[in-house]
Amino acid sequence: MKYAVKVIASAAYPLMFLLACQVVVAQDRTVKDGIFTEAQVNAGEVVYDASCKTCHNMRFYRDTLKSWNNQPLIYLWETIMGTMPADNPGSLLLEEYTDVIAYILSENGFPAGDMKLDPDNGMDVIHILSP
Protein backbone atom coordinates (compact mmCIF):
# COMPACT_ATOMS: atom_id res chain seq x y z
CA MET A 1 0.00 0.00 0.00
CA LYS A 2 2.81 2.43 0.89
CA TYR A 3 4.42 1.74 -2.48
CA ALA A 4 1.21 2.66 -4.33
CA VAL A 5 0.97 5.95 -2.43
CA LYS A 6 4.60 6.78 -3.31
CA VAL A 7 3.99 6.01 -6.99
CA ILE A 8 0.86 8.17 -7.09
CA ALA A 9 2.56 11.00 -5.19
CA SER A 10 5.65 10.94 -7.40
CA ALA A 11 3.45 11.06 -10.50
CA ALA A 12 1.43 13.95 -9.07
CA TYR A 13 4.40 16.29 -8.43
CA PRO A 14 5.26 16.90 -12.10
CA LEU A 15 1.59 17.47 -12.86
CA MET A 16 1.28 20.01 -10.05
CA PHE A 17 4.43 21.76 -11.32
CA LEU A 18 3.02 22.02 -14.85
CA LEU A 19 -0.27 23.39 -13.55
CA ALA A 20 1.56 25.98 -11.45
CA CYS A 21 3.58 27.08 -14.49
CA GLN A 22 0.41 27.52 -16.52
CA VAL A 23 -1.09 29.75 -13.84
CA VAL A 24 2.01 31.97 -13.80
CA VAL A 25 2.09 32.20 -17.60
CA ALA A 26 -1.63 32.99 -17.72
CA GLN A 27 -1.12 35.92 -15.35
CA ASP A 28 1.53 37.64 -17.50
CA ARG A 29 -0.04 40.25 -19.76
CA THR A 30 1.09 43.11 -21.94
CA VAL A 31 -0.22 46.58 -22.63
CA LYS A 32 -1.88 45.13 -25.75
CA ASP A 33 -4.32 43.11 -23.61
CA GLY A 34 -6.92 45.80 -22.82
CA ILE A 35 -5.56 46.44 -19.34
CA PHE A 36 -7.32 49.79 -18.75
CA THR A 37 -10.80 51.18 -19.33
CA GLU A 38 -12.03 53.93 -21.62
CA ALA A 39 -13.19 55.81 -18.50
CA GLN A 40 -9.59 55.80 -17.25
CA VAL A 41 -8.42 57.14 -20.61
CA ASN A 42 -10.93 60.00 -20.44
CA ALA A 43 -10.00 60.84 -16.84
CA GLY A 44 -6.30 60.57 -17.71
CA GLU A 45 -6.65 63.03 -20.57
CA VAL A 46 -8.01 65.68 -18.20
CA VAL A 47 -5.13 65.17 -15.75
CA TYR A 48 -2.57 65.02 -18.58
CA ASP A 49 -3.83 68.30 -20.07
CA ALA A 50 -3.65 70.00 -16.66
CA SER A 51 -0.39 68.54 -15.32
CA CYS A 52 1.74 66.99 -18.08
CA LYS A 53 1.07 68.52 -21.47
CA THR A 54 3.08 71.69 -20.89
CA CYS A 55 6.34 69.73 -20.67
CA HIS A 56 5.62 66.42 -22.42
CA ASN A 57 4.07 65.80 -25.82
CA MET A 58 3.03 62.31 -26.90
CA ARG A 59 6.24 61.85 -28.89
CA PHE A 60 8.09 61.96 -25.57
CA TYR A 61 5.97 59.10 -24.25
CA ARG A 62 6.31 57.09 -27.46
CA ASP A 63 10.09 57.19 -27.03
CA THR A 64 9.75 56.50 -23.31
CA LEU A 65 7.65 53.39 -23.94
CA LYS A 66 10.29 52.13 -26.37
CA SER A 67 12.96 52.46 -23.70
CA TRP A 68 10.78 50.58 -21.18
CA ASN A 69 10.07 47.69 -23.60
CA ASN A 70 9.46 44.36 -21.79
CA GLN A 71 9.62 46.00 -18.35
CA PRO A 72 6.76 45.64 -15.86
CA LEU A 73 4.31 48.53 -16.11
CA ILE A 74 4.53 49.09 -12.35
CA TYR A 75 8.11 50.36 -12.80
CA LEU A 76 6.98 53.10 -15.16
CA TRP A 77 4.04 53.96 -12.89
CA GLU A 78 6.34 54.24 -9.85
CA THR A 79 8.82 56.38 -11.79
CA ILE A 80 6.15 58.79 -13.01
CA MET A 81 4.54 58.92 -9.57
CA GLY A 82 7.86 59.63 -7.87
CA THR A 83 9.12 62.28 -10.30
CA MET A 84 6.11 64.04 -11.82
CA PRO A 85 4.93 66.69 -12.05
CA ALA A 86 8.48 68.03 -12.00
CA ASP A 87 7.52 71.02 -9.86
CA ASN A 88 5.66 68.88 -7.29
CA PRO A 89 6.41 65.13 -7.57
CA GLY A 90 3.86 62.81 -6.03
CA SER A 91 1.23 65.54 -5.79
CA LEU A 92 -1.43 63.76 -7.84
CA LEU A 93 -3.75 61.11 -6.47
CA LEU A 94 -2.65 57.52 -7.10
CA GLU A 95 -5.69 57.06 -9.32
CA GLU A 96 -4.73 60.13 -11.35
CA TYR A 97 -1.28 58.69 -12.06
CA THR A 98 -2.93 55.45 -13.14
CA ASP A 99 -5.38 57.30 -15.38
CA VAL A 100 -2.54 59.26 -17.00
CA ILE A 101 -0.77 55.96 -17.78
CA ALA A 102 -4.01 54.67 -19.36
CA TYR A 103 -4.24 57.84 -21.46
CA ILE A 104 -0.59 57.59 -22.56
CA LEU A 105 -1.02 53.94 -23.53
CA SER A 106 -4.23 54.71 -25.43
CA GLU A 107 -2.63 57.61 -27.31
CA ASN A 108 0.17 55.26 -28.34
CA GLY A 109 -2.20 52.76 -29.91
CA PHE A 110 -2.85 50.30 -27.09
CA PRO A 111 -6.49 49.23 -26.68
CA ALA A 112 -8.81 49.88 -23.78
CA GLY A 113 -10.67 46.93 -22.33
CA ASP A 114 -13.02 45.96 -19.52
CA MET A 115 -10.34 45.63 -16.85
CA LYS A 116 -9.55 48.64 -14.69
CA LEU A 117 -5.83 49.35 -14.40
CA ASP A 118 -4.80 49.29 -10.74
CA PRO A 119 -1.27 49.39 -9.29
CA ASP A 120 -2.35 47.11 -6.44
CA ASN A 121 -3.78 44.48 -8.75
CA GLY A 122 -1.35 42.98 -11.21
CA MET A 123 0.50 45.93 -12.71
CA ASP A 124 3.70 44.07 -11.83
CA VAL A 125 2.87 41.29 -14.34
CA ILE A 126 1.79 43.62 -17.16
CA HIS A 127 4.70 44.24 -19.51
CA ILE A 128 5.28 47.33 -21.61
CA LEU A 129 5.68 46.88 -25.36
CA SER A 130 7.06 49.37 -27.84
CA PRO A 131 4.31 51.24 -29.69
Spans of model-derived segments:
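The canonical Cys-X-X-Cys-His
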Residues: G44, Y48-M58, V100, I104
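Flexible coil segments in periplasmic/lumen-exposed cytochrome c-class electron-transfer proteins
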Residues: L92-P131
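Sequence context surrounding c-type heme c attachment/ligation sites in exported
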Residues: N42-D49, L65-I74, L94
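Short, non-ligating residues that shape and space the ligands of small metal-coordination modules
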Residues: Y61-R62
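An amphipathic alpha-helix signature
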Residues: L73-M81, Y97-A102
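Bacterial N-terminal signal peptides
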Residues: S10-A20
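Electrostatic cytochrome c docking/interface patches
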Residues: V24-V47
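N-terminal secretory signal peptides that target proteins for export/translocation
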Residues: M1-A9
